[in-house]
Amino acid sequence: MSNRLTAPPKKEFQSFHNFPIVSDLDNFKADIAFLGIPFGDPYSMGEASNDQCNAPTHIRRYCERALRGLDRYDFDIGGTLLNGEDVKVVDCGDVIGEAKDVAGNHDRSEKAVRKVLASGAMPIILGGDHAIPIPVFRALENHGPITLVQVDAHIDWRDVFHGVSYGLSSVIRRASEMNHFKEIF
């Protein structure tokens, strides 16, 4: 496996809203950076994975229709989406994953988010399953204090589930253990 953390978005849909694609996370400048974390099952990607691993591709595909014409007037915000501002937006592609290497996938995801943050860009994560916030939360350790608002049907407070402590059932529990989270609602 190479040292690259990300791969370009699938050619079929290209980048989010055709924003420039960034392949070198160590050398880019942007205000906003889209990053796909396409993992579909935090317990065993090969055994019972689901379609959540395709979410970044589908988000890019279906948002294209909604985002046509960034210069169009939006009544909700009282102007155009970027409002004539010189905002540089890029798409960093998807974090490269390996089936059966959940811990490695989380490590690569955390490293990729850290690199986006180090560039000065605000990361917008296109995910995958409910476990992907954990590496994103870890990457935010120098950006606190953070107030987290969880909107979900269940609390995601398990310590360990199926032998995994960094899965989709443990997201809020893991956040509560991180010093940079001030409050969780």
Predicted feature locations:
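Conserved alpha-helical scaffold segments that buttress catalytic/binding sites
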Residues: 2-185
